[in-house]
């Protein structure tokens, strides 16, 4: 990382890091921390805030690994949703009628792409020990023995249910969807708790209302819509992303906006609120005029957003595509090994 006074980033696992006893690169040094990543990252954030120069403003980027694949909950949350049945998306069994090849030829379906070992965790300890090259074992072995014991107990019922062999067709897809959601949302629980910890700390030191807090993500995510998990497509479920900004001194609580915003807007927004001149060559636009006006969209605000995904062939086999989205319509061009267009109406959304 460039330009930071202090940094601590996860390493390993395709540079995503591990959930249990994770490795970090911290200011150029490799360290291993004991515990659960979501908790540890928050500990580090609070430690940084405690040690900062109290006479200067601060900017801190607090990023979590969770809930990245393969959705491994904190030990305290293992199995917490095992008796919960989540509502299925209306298009969980999407047949992609009216869409082109891209939707049909992806490799990110709950039915076919979720793996029994890495994603669904359908391996016993004995089976992992027989094949220690298994990817699930590579993270399982990082757990303390008491966490392994709890893991085994929690997932034993899932493994037994699957191995009865009664699940076929749509029933199997529905079953996989439930396991996916149980692990995904159990993993998110620790994020919720730790954001609360951080906000409580800011309140404790008297800085909560003096700090601009931005809650966002790098993209949306498919949670069963179209029968998928993951992201990449320009469809609404993953093109739309959360963006919540709290700053009571200037932003009215509860105000919302339909203004089209993009991640390139973050930097000019931060500069604007900090009273720093925005460089003329910056691509985004400050969201401050929207935020301080109770979400009302300025007359000269952008009318469309551009999107481009080009990592094909790559994991999940999502075709290369670019497109434009307005408030009412979306036009997508899939290219490279295909040449197809999709136009979608958003008016009903």
What is the role of each PLM region?
Residues 11-35, 50-55, 61-210, 214-261, ...:
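Active-site-proximal cap/lid insertion segments
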Residues 45, 49, 270:
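Hydrophobic "lid"/C-terminal helical patch
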Residues 41-42, 232, 339-342:
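A short local loop/turn or secondary-structure capping micro-motif enriched for an aromatic residue
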Residues 1-2, 38, 42, 46, ...:
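FAD-dinucleotide binding site
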Residues 347-349:
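Conserved small/polar residues in nucleotide/adenosyl-binding loops
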Residues 3-14, 70, 219-225, 264-267, ...:
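C-terminal cap/loop subdomain of S1 sulfatases and analogous C-terminal strand-loop tails that border
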């Amino acid at each position: 990382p460039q330009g930071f006074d202090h940094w601590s980033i996860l390493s390993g696992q395709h540079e995503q890091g591990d959930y249990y006893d994770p490795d970090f690169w911290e200011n150029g040094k490799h360290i291993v921390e004991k515990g659960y990543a979501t908790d540890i990252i928050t500990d580090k954030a609070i430690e940084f805030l405690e040690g900062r120069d109290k006479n200067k403003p601060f900017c801190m980027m607090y990023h979590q690994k969770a809930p990245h694949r393969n959705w491994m909950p904190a030990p305290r949350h293992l199995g917490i949703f095992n008796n919960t049945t989540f509502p299925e998306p209306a298009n969980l069994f999407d047949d992609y009628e009216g869409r082109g090849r891209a939707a049909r030829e992806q490799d990110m379906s709950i039915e076919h792409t979720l793996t029994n070992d890495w994603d669904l965790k359908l391996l016993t300890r004995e089976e992992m020990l027989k094949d220690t090259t298994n990817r699930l074992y590579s993270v399982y072995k990082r757990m303390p023995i008491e966490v392994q014991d709890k893991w085994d107990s929690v997932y034993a019922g899932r493994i037994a249910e699957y191995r009865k062999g009664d699940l076929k067709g749509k029933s199997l897809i529905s079953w996989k969807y439930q396991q996916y959601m149980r692990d995904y949302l159990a993993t998110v629980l620790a994020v919720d708790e730790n954001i609360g910890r951080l906000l409580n700390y800011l309140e404790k030191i008297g800085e909560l209302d003096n700090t601009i807090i931005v809650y966002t993500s790098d993209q949306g995510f498919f949670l069963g819509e179209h029968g998928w998990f993951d992201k990449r497509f320009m469809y609404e479920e993953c093109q739309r992303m959360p963006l919540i900004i709290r700053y009571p001194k200037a932003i009215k609580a509860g105000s919302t906006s339909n203004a089209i915003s993009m991640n390139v807007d973050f930097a000019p927004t931060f500069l604007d609120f900090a009273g720093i001149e925005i460089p003329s060559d910056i691509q985004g636009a400050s969201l401050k005029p929207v935020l301080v006006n109770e979400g009302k969209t300025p007359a000269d605000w952008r009318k469309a957003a551009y999107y481009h995904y080009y990592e094909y062939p790559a994991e999940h086999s999502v075709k290369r595509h670019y497109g434009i989205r307005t408030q009412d319509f979306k036009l997508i061009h899939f290219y490279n090994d295909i040449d197809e267009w999709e136009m979608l109406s958003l008016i009903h959304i």
